[in-house]
Amino acid sequence: MFGHVFSRRTSFLVRCFHVAKKFSNPEPEDILFSALCLNLRQRRWNTLHQFSSSLTNPLISRVLREFRSSPKLALEFYNWVLRSNTVAKSENRFEASCVMIHLLVGSRRFDDALSIMANLMSVEGEKLSPLHVLSGLIRSYQACGSSPDVFDSLVRACTQNGDAQGAYEVIEQTRAEGFCVSVHALNNFMGCLLNVNEIDRFWKVYKEMDSLGYVENVNTFNLVIYSFCKESKLFEALSVFYRMLKCGVWPNVVSFNMMIDGACKTGDMRFALQLLGKMGMMSGNFVSPNAVTYNSVINGFCKAGRLDLAERIRGDMVKSGVDCNERTYGALVDAYGRAGSSDEALRLCDEMTSKGLVVNTVIYNSIVYWLFMEGDIEGAMSVLRDMNSKNMQIDRFTQAIVVRGLCRNGYVKEAVEFQRQISEKKLVEDIVCHNTLMHHFVRDKKLACADQILGSMLVQGLSLDAISFGTLIDGYLKEGKLERALEIYDGMIKMNKTSNLVIYNSIVNGLSKRGMAGAAEAVVNAMEIKDIVTYNTLLNESLKTGNVEEADDILSKMQKQDGEKSVSLVTFNIMINHLCKFGSYEKAKEVLKFMVERGVVPDSITYGTLITSFSKHRSQEKVVELHDYLILQGVTPHEHIYLSIVRPLLDRENGRP
């Protein structure tokens, strides 16, 4: 009886304790937290807006963690906070972002997590370093009950941004903090190294894998195969394939596609076909060709001009049940256009449409380009009109193809009008087409028109480059208008644009032709980088004016800059030409022997200059002797000079009429 009473009293006391707890004063943040959660569950955004000024990052993070089992709703809240809360838009946003990343990775919403990471590290976003993001993720790791997958995701975010160094730093720091990224993250990093052409670094990381406790998977082997194929080492790639089989790792279709594409790019179509035919046998009948496989082979044959074989592979592709796609048709359309069969290319486009495929901008560009190359202006413009009628958005390649095509065929006025329409509609903002128009106006000696193009570029706010200025500078220099050329150059410098070697060489050439050798040499001395064209220009002008001493000095400078490599065939031809003009024939012959000794092979210009000069001022025997010497050095004779000068001498020597 007493036990029963005691039990009831205990129960009563416990109930009293809970009631007391229930009616105790809760913390203000707890009240706000409960209100936020209640309204968030019912998506009452207008009501939530009333609390925005009271939000703190710890509170935001707490709400996000509360909804870890509802990641979609948590993400909606996170995005709402970013749009409406001033606190979260400051540097304090970072804490909530890290919590959100943990929740998204935990719920396998990797794309959303990667998007937040990319925004944190982008110039448009917070512009945080990968290591800064990593530190935030590590701080919130425990509270969010996260997994190492979050570090894999950060590595992937870096590699997607092309930041190989950032990915490396994350991997190293993660290891230093007692965590470890998976082999998938390491594969991502190594793939990024290959994409940015850091081949040596790729091999270094690959060789360290085993010592770090990683086991290669099929993706690792595929990367190694890709690396060898990238360097056209097909035999080594095949060796890796067989090593993969010995390790008990079965290949996938990517393994074969890497090798087949590598073979096609090196032109080894026989090897590509062998791999295509043996895919089943080499994979234990687990792998069969897909659209990528067939497209690689079709593209390879198209590049080789073997359209018959490309069509045969397309037939095999259809028979095997693999549908042709835009890439299949794109390769064939381009190949038929290159072969001058535009009608067949257009027929393929109709076939595409009948199969429900879209003729994309790339394919249209290809057709327009080859029609212009054939000189079929009306056909090209008709295809362009068809693009417009189908609301197909033209890109900068379309614009460049049309402008160049019209200019190339003499329709410069039409090209200007087309460019004007593009600029007015603001469809594409690209300086390449403006530069093309300037080039053609300069070539046609319409410098005032070229000036107008430059002016319109400035009005449109386009960022001019060295080609824009260089084209106009070269045009004015060729017309002998040195002062105007220098005005444009000064304008370029005032706009903080960097000159290049081509512009400097044009100015040096212009000054030299005006007899301003001193000024030309001063420009050369001020140039940080000089090339063979720079020196050849000075050398030519020095020899033209008979200043042999100055020419000798220039030749010495050339040799000092880069040894004998800097003295090219053009240099020797300039020297031989001027020595012959000054009557120094034996000296010219010495220069010839000097160039041969240094491994520079004479060409038909060398042959023509020497044979013509020797035929006028030396005996017939000397001419024939010189001809024989040049032939022995591997020179192909200048046809006209050989037939008109040397052949008659040889016939006379052999007693022929």
From Swiss-Prot:
<keyword id="KW-0496">Mitochondrion</keyword>
<dbReference type="GO" id="GO:0005739">
    <property type="term" value="C:mitochondrion"/>
</dbReference>
<feature type="transit peptide" description="Mitochondrion">
    <location>
        <begin position="1"/>
        <end position="74"/>
    </location>
</feature>
<feature type="repeat" description="PPR 6">
    <location>
        <begin position="325"/>
        <end position="359"/>
    </location>
</feature>
<dbReference type="InterPro" id="IPR011990">
    <property type="entry name" value="TPR-like_helical_dom_sf"/>
</dbReference>
<feature type="repeat" description="PPR 3">
    <location>
        <begin position="217"/>
        <end position="251"/>
    </location>
</feature>
<dbReference type="Pfam" id="PF01535">
    <property type="entry name" value="PPR"/>
</dbReference>
<feature type="repeat" description="PPR 4">
    <location>
        <begin position="252"/>
        <end position="282"/>
    </location>
</feature>
<feature type="repeat" description="PPR 8">
    <location>
        <begin position="395"/>
        <end position="429"/>
    </location>
</feature>
<keyword id="KW-0677">Repeat</keyword>
<feature type="repeat" description="PPR 2">
    <location>
        <begin position="182"/>
        <end position="216"/>
    </location>
</feature>
<feature type="repeat" description="PPR 7">
    <location>
        <begin position="360"/>
        <end position="394"/>
    </location>
</feature>
<feature type="repeat" description="PPR 5">
    <location>
        <begin position="290"/>
        <end position="324"/>
    </location>
</feature>
<feature type="repeat" description="PPR 1">
    <location>
        <begin position="147"/>
        <end position="181"/>
    </location>
</feature>
<feature type="repeat" description="PPR 9">
    <location>
        <begin position="430"/>
        <end position="464"/>
    </location>
</feature>
<feature type="repeat" description="PPR 14">
    <location>
        <begin position="603"/>
        <end position="637"/>
    </location>
</feature>
<feature type="repeat" description="PPR 13">
    <location>
        <begin position="568"/>
        <end position="602"/>
    </location>
</feature>
<feature type="repeat" description="PPR 12">
    <location>
        <begin position="531"/>
        <end position="565"/>
    </location>
</feature>
<dbReference type="Pfam" id="PF13041">
    <property type="entry name" value="PPR_2"/>
</dbReference>
<feature type="repeat" description="PPR 11">
    <location>
        <begin position="500"/>
        <end position="530"/>
    </location>
</feature>
<feature type="repeat" description="PPR 10">
    <location>
        <begin position="465"/>
        <end position="499"/>
    </location>
</feature>
<protein>
    <recommendedName>
        <fullName>Pentatricopeptide repeat-containing protein At1g11710, mitochondrial</fullName>
    </recommendedName>
</protein>
<dbReference type="InterPro" id="IPR002885">
    <property type="entry name" value="Pentatricopeptide_rpt"/>
</dbReference>
<dbReference type="InterPro" id="IPR051240">
    <property type="entry name" value="Mito_RNA-Proc/Resp"/>
</dbReference>
<keyword id="KW-0809">Transit peptide</keyword>
<comment type="similarity">
    <text>Belongs to the PPR family. P subfamily.</text>
</comment>
